[in-house]
Structures are given as structure tokens and as C-alpha cells.
Amino acid sequence: MKRVLITGISGKNGRYLLEEMSKNRERDDLDNIHFKVLLRESSDTSFLDECPLDIERYYGSIDTKEDALKFVDGEYDTLLHIAGIQRSVQIVSAAIEKGVKRFILVHTTGIYSKYKEAGEGYRQIDAKVKEICEEAKATLTILRPTMIYGSLNDGNISVFIKMVDKLRLFPVINGAKYELQPVWCKDLGKAFYDVLMNPEITDSKEYDLSGGKPILLIDIFKEIGNQLGVKNTFISVPSGIEYLGAWIVYILTFKKKDYREKVQRMVEPRAYSHEKAANDFNYSPHEFKDGVKEEIIMYKQLKETKNK
């Protein structure tokens, strides 16, 4: 491995990956590897300025195959794609054309959902990239994180934090008694690095990357409340009522707004074992109560700033 392409480096997961790269630079002889990273013009790149590694910055997008071909131009042997499953087909197709033979794609455990809208599209993308790599005799490793948290714009736990902070009477579907296993982005950054640096172990495999232990959604809410220092009264609402409400919205908007499947997914358990990753590269993620501390501190600091 001498020349590596990386997408998604400016996201929270990517920044923790870069942290691991910098930390292990001498031990793993990273000075002999050339990295090319994808950035948008609007990206904050200050975190790259003091990085001692050989990193080439490419500003652009990979929204189409034509865009992706510009990014992968050159002689590269490995692609680590963190920038979203929806762009996997075009970036893999482009990289194959340029001779890349090793792929690490960050996809999602959403592939396991029994609901069509949530899972079917992901399954189709998985199948397509596998077909492309198989035809090109390229190795493909797929990483599937669960619900990711650790950023105030993660769209997951950050939403829960705001809700817990603002709602003293807190409605929850079916008592919120179903298991999740959210994963801290710092644990993902380390996992991405370990997979990248251990091709002899991780090539051509698939790994679910979940958090430390399964946790009930109601316990997630309670832990957030404890760390925020607030008390909530949780009111259980039957899922049937929520689903009926989604149907009413669907009808009243003349089928323009369809929340039916989203409501169904809200009561779908999403806890997955990471035993395979633990066995292969010592993946050992934090438990939720420890990992979420940093995000709650960031939330409190932002709130204080706004209140000044």
C-alpha cells in the first residue's frame, strides 16, 4: 500500500481517522504512503494544516462518475470511502477504471432493516459494488456502523439531546423499550485505521461496527437527562396511534409526505454484534454513557454561547 484515496476526511469520523494516522505515523511508517483526500470548497481544512503526513488535497465532488474520475485520476492502489453509501457505485466504478484494486467502503447496518424503503436501496448498492469488484478481481471490505454519534450535527443523538433538554413531558413510542447500539465516531476513526493498515486480515470481509453494548432507547434518554442535569416524565404512546397519524398526514398531503415507514422503523431494534471486528482487529468501542459525554459537553457550551 503506497498510494491511498480517502473520501469523507473532513467529517467527524474522518478527523478521528486522521488523528489515528498522525498518532501512528512513525510506528506504521506512514511517511512512505501518499494520501489524496476529497474535500469540498466549503470544507474547513484547518485540521489538515499541521498534519505531518503526505496528504494531497483535492477539492471537488463525487456526485457523478465523471466527477469521481477526476478525483481518482492517478495511480492509486487503495480507496477508503467514508463519504456515504449513496456515492459508492460511482466512486468504485471510477476507481476500477483507474486501476484501484483494494476497496474499503463505509456503508450501514440499515441494510438489515425489514422495511423496504429503509433497507432495499442499501442492499441494491451493496450488491452492485460487489459485482463491480468481483468482475475487476478487486478486494472489497464493507464496514457497517450502527447509529453514529459524537457531533452536534450527527442527526441522531444530537436530536435526542435537544429533545431531552427541552421536553419535560416526553412522549415515547411503546415505552421506548427496544435495543439500539449507537457507536461513537472516535471508535469508528480507530476502526477505519485498523482496517486500512491490516489488509492481510481485513480484505474481502464485512464488519458490523456497533457501540460497546446494546442499550434500550429509554435508557439512552435517561442517560442524556442525567448528564444534562434535567428530569423528564416519559409518556408511553402506542405505536398504532403514531402509525395512524402518519397515515392521516399521508392522506391529507395527497401522498406527498409519507412518514409511515419511518414510524415503523422507530420501533425496530437495531443492535448488532461487533464480535467479528473484535476478533480480527481488536475493535473495542466505548459504552454509550462514556462516549456521549463529549457531545453533551459540546451541546452545553453551544447553548451557553447562544444565551450570552
Please place each PLM-identified region on the residue numbering.
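Conserved Rossmann-fold NAD(P)-dependent oxidoreductase catalytic core, especially the SDR/UDP-sugar
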Residues: T78, V89-T141
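N-terminal Rossmann NAD(P)H-binding glycine-rich loop of SDR-like oxidoreductase domains
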Residues: R3-R27
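Glycine-rich "substrate-gating" loop/helix at the edge of Rossmann-like oxidoreductase active sites
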Residues: T146-N153, N174-C185, G211-K213
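Mid/C-terminal beta-alpha module of Rossmann-like enzyme folds, strongest
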Residues: N198-D258, H274, D280-K308
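A conserved pocket-lining segment of Rossmann-fold NAD(P)-dependent short-chain dehydrogenase/reductase
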Residues: K162-V183, A191-V195, T202-D203, D208
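N-terminal Rossmann-fold cofactor-binding loop
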Residues: L38-S43, S61-I62
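Conserved Rossmann-fold cofactor-binding substructure of NAD(P)-dependent oxidoreductases
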Residues: E56-Y76
